[in-house]
Amino acid sequence: MNIGILILATNTYLPLGMRLVSRFHHFYKGNANIKFYFCSNQNPIAYLKDEIDVKFIFNMHESWLEGTNSKFKNLLSLENEDLDYIYYMDADTNVLQEFDEEWMLGDTVGAQHFNDQDLQKDEKAYDRNPKSKAYIPFDTELPQMYYHGAFFGGKKSNLLEMCQTMQEWQDQDQLIPYEPAVNDESYINAYFHYNPPAKVLPYSDFKFWPSDGGGIPSKRNPQSTSYLTKEIIKNKDKLWDIQDNRVTYE
């Protein structure tokens, strides 16, 4: 079984993406062939253990928004890769425990957002602009769950079909022009609202730790992180993390 993991890690997210690949590889105890697709303005391969299977996909983004809006396009670029499943993971996701692939396999897979039954218990953060392709009305009669934009995937053909639809939605909204309330996450929620995922990963059972920026200040603003990458390349064979804006070791 071949599983592809696509990570967007341009600019300040570069060391966080390296951390995700390194720690995913360390804690993964399954039997699938895992290949990482690392979308960035800098090649990460020299900073990672030699045995990790990584393909570098050059991306240049002038802003966080430009980066996050390239998500579907980058996933669609994997069409000719020899993969059975494809998953997207945010670069600032951390891995803190052992896991295998079984818990996340499904035809289409969505992850419940950690705010779904907390801050969004009574009202979801859906896009409410009727002109947008991400629109979900307040009076929808369909079941409501708010999904993460930080993690989704499924069988290759299903994931590519989903991304093709969302890319078309995004392109049409940009002609208005309109940017949905929560960017690409708004399209993901609209898609899953009308096409529920075959498998939902409850937040209580989620194996990863999303939105862990490692204490890097203003991570959405492009800035140099060479003070981190210099440490990473010297210690790439260790189990390392980023906490309090510095590289730490376990």
Stretches with model-predicted labels:
Residues 6, 37, 55, 87-89, ...:
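Hydrophobic/aromatic beta-strand patches that form the interior of the parallel beta-sheet core
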